[in-house]
């Protein structure tokens, strides 16, 4: 039986694709469902998973959230669930003790230090839904957070999404970041290859950063519209299942367009107020 220390550290691994399963345990790109421009990037996704598990292994009070909704019409499998499946299929890369039942066989349930977040449709909500999932599972808000994603997204994720105008997980010193870039990035993004086929996508990353700067909660028509376009399975975009849960969380939210829930601009951020009981 696994005994978990009282958790206070949330590790978030942001999903970028969907592992469909297979005998190579994610080490064959044919097992993945990804956009064409992400060709060659699936080894990086595996490294994100491994890196998140390493942070988890180094801190007995950490809990990891694999985050991402079912963004593809071809399968209802979510990014977050597929990442958790891949981690388990690879024996957690030897970094975590595997759960075993009384017969000594590997237990089928999720590892107790792993959360699967299956609603997020963009990077802002990777963080926000994961924070709520941590509170829901452990009845406290995390004191620290580590985000694992592409290195070139650090400014957007940490300074933007977690900054004072958005999620406001403060101060900045409470946030760690593990950045691992995919291959063949243009030189201005830390790569060494010309990667002409990726330049348009990377220019889009610049544009997205600008969009978030003027709409830090992603509630405007452009960013909210992108989320709707990534939601072929009509996954619920509310942060809380019911009003009582919302009240107990201490989080102040608003509804956007009738189908999404967002933080209020200047509302209480309970993760900055010390332990919050469920």
Model segments located where?
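C-terminal capping/extension of enzyme domains
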Residues: 189-260
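Short, flexible loop segments at boundaries between secondary-structure elements
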Residues: 168-204
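A short acidic (Asp/Glu
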Residues: 75-79, 125-129, 156-162
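Extended hydrophobic secondary-structure segments that form protein cores and membrane-embedded regions
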Residues: 65-67, 113-118, 144-150, 177-179
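Protein-protein interaction regions
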Residues: 7, 11, 20, 163-178
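A contiguous pocket-lining binding segment that forms or flanks enzyme active sites
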Residues: 135, 141-174
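N-terminal beta-strand-loop-alpha-helix module at the start
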Residues: 1-122, 233-278
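Internal catalytic-core helix/loop-beta-alpha segment
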Residues: 113-138
């Amino acid at each position: 039986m696994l005994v978990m220390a009282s958790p206070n550290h949330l590790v978030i691994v942001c999903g970028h694709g969907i592992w469909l399963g297979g005998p190579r345990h994610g080490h064959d790109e044919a097992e993945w469902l990804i956009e064409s421009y992400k060709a060659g990037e699936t080894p990086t996704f595996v490294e994100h998973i491994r890196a998140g598990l390493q942070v988890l292994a180094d801190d007995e009070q950490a809990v990891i959230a694999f985050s991402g909704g079912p963004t593809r019409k071809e399968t209802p499998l979510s990014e977050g669930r597929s990442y958790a499946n891949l981690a388990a299929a690879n024996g957690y890369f030897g970094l975590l003790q595997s759960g075993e039942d009384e017969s000594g066989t590997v237990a089928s349930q999720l590892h107790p230090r792993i959360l699967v977040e299956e609603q997020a449709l963009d990077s802002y909500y990777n963080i926000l839904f994961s924070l709520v999932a941590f509170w829901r599972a452990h009845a406290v808000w995390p004191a620290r957070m580590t985000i694992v994603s592409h290195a070139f997204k650090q400014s957007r994720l940490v300074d933007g999404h977690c900054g004072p105008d958005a999620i406001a997980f403060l101060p900045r010193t409470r946030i760690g970041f593990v950045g691992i870039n995919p291959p063949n990035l243009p030189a201005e993004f830390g790569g060494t290859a010309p990667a002409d086929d990726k330049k348009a996508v990377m220019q889009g990353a610049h544009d997205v950063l600008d969009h978030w700067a003027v709409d830090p909660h992603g509630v405007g028509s452009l960013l909210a519209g992108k989320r709707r376009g990534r939601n072929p399975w009509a996954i619920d975009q509310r942060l809380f299942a019911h009003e009582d849960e919302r009240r107990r969380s201490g989080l102040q939210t608003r509804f956007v367009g009738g189908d999404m829930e967002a933080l209020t601009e200047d509302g209480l951020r309970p993760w900055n107020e010390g332990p919050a009981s469920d």
